[in-house]
């Protein structure tokens, strides 16, 4: 329990700080830019997602608490992957704080560097989580990670489609695309809640919200649609490949490594030795029973068939 507590406090604490800064940026602004003024200057931000963003702190904190709360103390197998994942989560939270502060104070270059580092940290965290799940197949919280991945993929797909159409000169409104997206999300929420996959549901919604903030605030406002299209499509490809690989490996029958085979052979040999020892002990405890049995076999030998 000590390892679990010591990891949970810094990871959750830094994430809460980041969420508070995001909420302040929405409501008051850290550089004299209020929420109303921000949306007045950027009419394309007025989508259904705008109102859903106010649920980010609650949904994401609940999801993170659930994910960390289900991580049992690790002993032996998977310990290195577990610690690596927690280091990456902690690093991504710290970078997120730097990113949101530099963006609000209009340090564009620093914010862009922090954005790239954030993607790197999160990618490494997901890779470590995947390795940990493959090593400890009872880690049910992996559904949370899969939900986050799928939530990001859904958002990036719609964002990429919108930016590509606009770059091609076609008139498109993000509101229409996000309207369809929210219908899809509403259907998934209803389905997942009905079948009881609440971990997966929280991961899906949290991933959609978190990456939605990232894309709309940094890429769309600070760069052009060409950059959005390239980065979004690249990320969609990476996430889809990661999901396919993750599902394939988790569904595949685990292969025994040479060390596992040696351990199994050792256990079988120990079992045979123990059975022989028990048989000898039974003979020593009741020798008369076995003596009578031998005499009967000598007097009445088995008839050949």
Report residues per predicted region.
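N-terminal membrane topogenic signal
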Residues: 1-11
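Alpha-helical transmembrane segments of multi-pass membrane proteins
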Residues: 15-32
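Short aromatic-rich membrane-water interface segments that cap or initiate transmembrane helices
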Residues: 40-55, 140-149, 170-176
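Internal transmembrane alpha-helix with an interfacial aromatic "cap," most often the third helix
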Residues: 61-138
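Membrane-interface capping segments at transmembrane-helix boundaries
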Residues: 72-73, 128-133, 243-259
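Membrane-interface helix caps and helix-loop-helix hairpins in membrane proteins
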Residues: 99-113, 166-173, 194-197, 218-224
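Alpha-helical transmembrane segments in multipass membrane proteins, preferentially the mid-helix core
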Residues: 122-131, 153-167, 181-197
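Central hydrophobic cores of alpha-helical transmembrane segments
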Residues: 200-213
């Amino acid at each position: 329990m000590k390892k679990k507590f010591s990891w949970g406090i810094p990871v959750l604490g830094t994430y809460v700080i980041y969420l508070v800064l995001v909420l302040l940026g929405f409501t008051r602004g850290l550089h004299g830019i209020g929420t109303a003024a921000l949306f007045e200057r950027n009419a394309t931000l007025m989508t259904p997602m705008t109102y859903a963003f106010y649920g980010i702190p609650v949904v994401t904190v609940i999801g993170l608490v659930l994910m960390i709360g289900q991580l049992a103390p690790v002993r032996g197998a998977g310990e290195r992957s577990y610690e690596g994942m927690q280091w990456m989560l902690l690093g991504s939270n710290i970078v997120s704080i730097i990113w949101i502060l530099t963006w609000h104070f209009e340090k564009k270059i620093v914010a862009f560097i922090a954005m790239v580092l954030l993607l790197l940290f999160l990618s490494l965290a997901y890779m470590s989580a995947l390795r940990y799940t493959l090593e400890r197949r009872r880690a049910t919280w992996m559904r949370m990670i899969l939900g986050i991945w799928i939530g990001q993929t859904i958002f990036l797909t719609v964002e990429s489609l919108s930016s590509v159409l606009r770059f091609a000169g076609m008139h498109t409104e993000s509101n229409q695309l996000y309207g369809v997206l929210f219908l899809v999300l509403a259907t998934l929420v209803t389905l997942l809640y009905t079948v009881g996959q609440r971990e997966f549901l929280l991961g899906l919604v949290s991933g959609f919200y978190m990456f939605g903030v990232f894309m709309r605030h940094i890429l769309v406002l600070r760069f052009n649609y060409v950059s959005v299209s390239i980065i979004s499509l690249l990320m969609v490809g990476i996430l889809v490949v990661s999901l396919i690989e993750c599902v394939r490996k988790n569904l595949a029958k685990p292969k025994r490594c040479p060390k596992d085979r040696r351990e199994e052979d050792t256990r079988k040999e120990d079992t045979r030795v123990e059975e022989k020892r028990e048989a000898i002990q039974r003979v020593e405890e009741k020798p008369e029973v076995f003596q009578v049995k031998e005499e009967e076999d000598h007097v009445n030998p088995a008839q050949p068939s």
